[in-house]
């Protein structure tokens, strides 16, 4: 099978992502939870593999990400790492595992020992101290602002963020704060295209969009979503890349191409 062929591409590192942003090369990111898919995604040249707390939804059948534990993320991170992908491995810190900088560091150490090369957690200005604490201790950090699914109850549902002038200003403050604290990557979720574009222009680090328009430095989707494996209503920002493709590998290749050439996301996938 094609995806089992050896890849000669160099490993994707944190500095490599920054170089891609500066060169104008889009970053293709997907969630991944096991060794088999890690190998397949790597052969398709996915740049970043995210062990997301979305596993609570797509693997465990949960309605939110809140029940996912640190042990869950560590287990799936180890599964992905065993495939030795050349992609950068990023792992989520689940709800309740980064309430203090010390808690966040202990959680990050566990995930990095499992094979993560960067950790991601949700929040803006209020997490700047935590970001700085981790970065000073050699833990690369990806921040996540906009619609942060762990805050679903505080938001009153899964709603687009930054639609008002005040909301957009706060989102920009959040993004600047985590960058100044040392975050090397930031996810913008469910953010109006114009707001995400402004954030991307204002920051010097790469931005990864999901429902945030095509002006971000890269894109991320949940693997199951982009393969058409989702219950109920499909989110606006999702495209089913399995349509018209002969295999999962071909669908992932199509996703990577679409991100790289800027054809995904289109206006129909944005806010």
Curated annotation (Swiss-Prot):
Entry cofactors: Mg(2+)
Query: Which one GO biological process term can you cite for this protein?
Result: pantothenate biosynthetic process
Any one GO molecular function term: 3-methyl-2-oxobutanoate hydroxymethyltransferase activity
**Gene Ontology CC: one annotated term:** cytoplasm
Keyword Magnesium set for record: yes
InterPro entries reported for this sequence = Pantoate_hydroxy_MeTrfase, Pyrv/PenolPyrv_kinase-like_dom, Pyrv_kinase-like_dom_sf
* Membership in a protein family: Belongs to the PanB family.
Q: How is the cofactor bound?
A: Binds 1 Mg(2+) ion per subunit.
Q: What is the protein's quaternary organization?
A: Homodecamer; pentamer of dimers.
Q: Where in the cell is it found?
A: Cytoplasm
Task: Identify the residues that bind Mg(2+).
Answer: 53, 92, 122
Where do the annotations place 3-methyl-2-oxobutanoate binding? 53-54, 92, 120
Print the organism lineage. Answer: Bacteria, Pseudomonadati, Pseudomonadota, Betaproteobacteria, Burkholderiales
Species this chain originates from: Burkholderia thailandensis (strain ATCC 700388 / DSM 13276 / CCUG 48851 / CIP 106301 / E264)
Pfam families for this protein: Pantoate_transf
Q: Which UniProt keywords apply?
A: Cytoplasm, Magnesium, Metal-binding, Pantothenate biosynthesis, Transferase
UniProt name for this protein: 3-methyl-2-oxobutanoate hydroxymethyltransferase
Q: What does this protein do?
A: Catalyzes the reversible reaction in which hydroxymethyl group from 5,10-methylenetetrahydrofolate is transferred onto alpha-ketoisovalerate to form ketopantoate.
Assigned EC number: 2.1.2.11
Query: Any idea which residues are catalytic in this one?
Result: 189 (proton acceptor)
Q: Which reaction does it catalyse?
A: 3-methyl-2-oxobutanoate + (6R)-5,10-methylene-5,6,7,8-tetrahydrofolate + H2O = 2-dehydropantoate + (6S)-5,6,7,8-tetrahydrofolate
| Top-level taxon of origin | Bacteria
- Please state the pathway this protein functions in, per its UniProt record: Cofactor biosynthesis; (R)-pantothenate biosynthesis; (R)-pantoate from 3-methyl-2-oxobutanoate: step 1/2
